[in-house]
Amino acid sequence: MIMGLENLKPAKGSVKKIKRVGRGQGSGMGKTATRGGKGQTARTGYKAKRGFEGGQQPLQRRLPKIGFRTKDSHIYSINVEKNEAIKNLEEITFSSLRALHHFPLYIEGVKLIGKDAKNLASKIKDERIKTSGQK
């Protein structure tokens, strides 16, 4: 037999039988048409809201809220006592601190804290950097 478009058949098991609902008891999908009993879900046009769990407290309301970021101040604190690299810098700039600490881009200012922070005030060359005790 010559292979041609008229001889092609789909692979066995690849074509599913069409589910015809509501076409009599003999079909096995009559009466309630696979929708279960009575109620809201049996009606036409019903669509459950996203996250609806049938009256149970939804998952997104059971879990705690996380990820709040204040809009007021984005100031990053660095403890000078724990970081010797800052003491060794000749000039303390915003970009040099970012290179050392890799803090996020939304940070608008840096505060140097610790006992030795006031001694570093003369090295600071950027107005976005403050030391402890300074406002």
UniProtKB/Swiss-Prot annotation:
Superkingdom of this protein's organism: Bacteria
Molecular function GO labels: rRNA binding; structural constituent of ribosome
Matches recorded under InterPro entries: Ribosomal_uL15 (IPR030878), Ribosomal_uL15/eL18_sf (IPR036227), Ribosomal_uL15_bac-type (IPR005749)
SUPFAM superfamilies xrefs: Ribosomal proteins L15p and L18e
A GO biological process held by the record: translation
PANTHER family named in the record: 50S RIBOSOMAL PROTEIN L15 (PTHR12934), LARGE RIBOSOMAL SUBUNIT PROTEIN UL15M (PTHR12934:SF11)
Name the record gives this protein: Large ribosomal subunit protein uL15
Species this protein is from: Helicobacter pylori (strain HPAG1)
Record gene name: rplO
